[in-house]
Structures are given as C-alpha cells and as structure tokens.
C-alpha cells in the first residue's frame, strides 16, 4: 500500500452500529460478516441510515450475485448469516477501490479535481452551513469549521452523492446540477431485530447483469465530467445505490478533512428503473410519481396513495419484507418487523427538513382487507380534519364579527385568517393522531381496527376542541362563538358513527 492510499472503508471503523447497548464503529467487512451480532446501524441522521444500508446492500448484491429468488434470502435467514467466502473474495478483489484517499481512485470521488477554490466539507451535509446556504439545524460557518474525522467525511460523502438536490453549480462548464437519485423521494427501509435481518428484508431479488457499482467501473476523471460530458442511464440497482451525483475530492489534512474539491458529477438519463426503496402514487392525470415526504404532514397520512387500490406502486423493499414475513410465519420463525420511512423535504435546491418516521409493519398489509381498512381510516381522518379546519374558521369569524370585506385581501380577512390559524384545533388533532396511527396500523388487517380508529379520532378531536375552548378565552363574543361551534363540533362527531363514504 502506497503512502497516498489511506483509510480503507472495508477495514477501518466508520459505520456506527449498536452492539450490546453501545455504539461502535466497524468497516464494511465486519458489518456484513458479523451482521447478526449488531442490533442495527445507529446514527442520529436519517440520511446516513439510508445510505449506509444502500452501500451494504450494493456490496451484498454484487458479492452474492443475487439473491436470484426469495428462497435464497429465506435460506440465509435460516442459517443466521450470509455466505462468508464470496463476500471476503469480492471485497479482496476490489479492495483498492475502497480507499477514501487514493492517488488514482479515491472511493466515490474524482482524483484529479483541482484543490483551487475548495469548498468546506460541510457542504456535503444539508444540516450544516456552507457558503450562502442557510443552516438547517446547525450554526457552523466556514470561519469556525471543525475538521471532519475520516469516518464523518466518508459518511457525509455517501449522503451527498445520494441526496444532493439539484441547483446552481457553475463549475467546470456546468451551470446547474440535477438531483441526486433520492434527493426527493421517501425511502422505505424495513428493519428486523438485528442488522442481518434488516439487510435480508431489503435484499430484493436481483439480476447482476447490466449493472455495476461505482467501484467496478473505471475511475472518473475531471475530463469525464466537464461540461456534463458523462451521462449514464438511471438504471441498475447497485449503480443507482452508488451514483456519483457530484464530483468530490476530499482534501486530507493528515488527521481529518476541512475542505474538498467540488464539481459536476455524472448526469442521470431518465429511465424506467424503479429504485427498490421508492414507492409511487398515481396523480390526477394518470401519471406515476414518486412518493415524497411533506413538510406540513406526517407520512402516514399518504400511506394509502402507494397501494394498488389507488393505482400506486409499493416500494419493492416493502413488498419483499411483507412476503418474507409471511414465509417466516408459515415456518414458525419469528420476524418482528418495523418500517422506517427516511428522507428529506426540499424546495428546489433548499432542504427544509430531514425525517425519520417509524411504524410497525403488520403482516398482511398488502391484503385486500388491510388495504380497504387503511383507505377507509385515512379517509375518515382527513374528512374529520377538514371539518375541524372549517370549524376553526367559523369560530374565528364569529369572534371577529362580520364586516365589509371590501376588495382584495382586506385587513378583515387577514385578521380572520390569523385568528383561525392560531387556534390549536386542527394542529392538536393531527398531533394526537401521529401517536395513535401506529397502534391502528399494527392491527390494520383486523375487523375491529376501524372501530379502534374511530375512537382514536373521537378522542383526538375532543382533546383538541377542549384545548381550543381554553385558548379562546371567556369574553362575551368568545363564549358566543364557542356555543355556536359546539353544535358544529357535535355534528362532526356524530358523523364518525356512520360508515365512511366510498
């Protein structure tokens, strides 16, 4: 190994895992060969959690040339581990391509990107400040930028290549860059009781032909990327899992990284490939669109949009996990599974939020009965939510009083809107349901689940209305508004006893 070859991701500790209640860091080899010993990948960052799993899955797919069928996955589950020799052989064969620093082929980077006009490493993570971008959660600036450890830099590199939103670039003949492969979609990651189970739950059957991860193709050079010269079809599972969305060259300072060379990456050509972790919904025009996270609402409210009843397409990882769970139950094997929905909310090039939502994954979620119950439950919740929103507007109108509204957006309308939005009615209702939904979802296939959900809706609405009454006050106009609102609120609760309109 030459002096310029440094920090091999196969052996060096950089992937945080939970073992025996403690977080330790391991390399790719240990993570895969001892996956059964680790509870899970443990990181506060939902984006890191997603990309670390995608990297490990890419290595497994290529090392095992599969799985070719679900039976392969079930066999590895029964045996309690992956075949070790193929994994060791594969990692040894491509060992030189996993150095974070390398004169010719640094991992997921471009070796000849110039050092001039470097950017801070923090640009790799949406939650850290960089240049003129506003901070999301952190107040780091280029003046007080701490060094990233090699492990931090490696994880940040993976996050950026998968999640970088498109936007202005103006480097090396490229004015703007396109979205990284999963910059917009919600990602579905079923998880088991240890890292081995989690990887198996996401190891969707795979055909290795016409696919290659970044370490199996010749290293990219600046000349390949200038002027958006290199374009690849967005196809091939491991190609997409390890996509070089941007040209990056981490600049080693001997004990960490503060700056990097930065430029354009490989431009994606649209293709029919579906990322296994991504679901799709049908829009009003009959087009399939990727399912995204929303800044205003929790993901569960959009769950049914991906189900076949509504013309959507479930993420392949979710379908695979459901099928595997059924097989395990048939054999009397335990398989408690949860579902993690990961991703970011962005507006063009600006990242607004980073999310991880965790739900139980019920057996039989994709059965007709479960789909029907879920669709009805979400429709009930939305109808009551809309009713409460209208109620808040009516209460606000009664408090403000009727006035001449004039033309355009009058002060009256602004006052009315401000008061209605300040009432906690709708906000507290949805907040309560965020906590209630997982309990319903765990039993979604059961006949009684809708009755339980109605009670949850009723309880959430009642508590939200009580809080609204306390919030509004006891002035004469306020009491009159609440008295009028009480009748409307009673009508809304009465409708809960009726069957959902279909």
Curated annotation (Swiss-Prot):
Keywords: Antiviral defense, Plasmid. CDD domains: Cse1_I-E (cd09669). InterPro entries: CRISPR-assoc_prot_Cse1. Coiled coil: none annotated. It comes from the Bacteria. GO terms for biological process: defense response to virus. CRISPR (clustered regularly interspaced short palindromic repeat), is an adaptive immune system that provides protection against mobile genetic elements (viruses, transposable elements and conjugative plasmids). CRISPR clusters contain sequences complementary to antecedent mobile elements and target invading nucleic acids. CRISPR clusters are transcribed and processed into CRISPR RNA (crRNA). Monomer. Part of the Cascade ribonucleoprotein complex. Interacts directly with the 5' end of crRNA, CasB, CasD and CasE. Binding of target ssRNA or dsDNA causes a conformational change in the Cascade complex; CasA is required for high affinity target DNA binding. Interacts with Cas3 once Cascade has recognized target DNA. NCBIfam families: casA_cse1. Belongs to the CRISPR associated protein CasA/Cse1 family. Type I-E/Ecoli subfamily. This is CRISPR-associated protein CasA/Cse1. It comes from Thermus thermophilus (strain ATCC 27634 / DSM 579 / HB8).
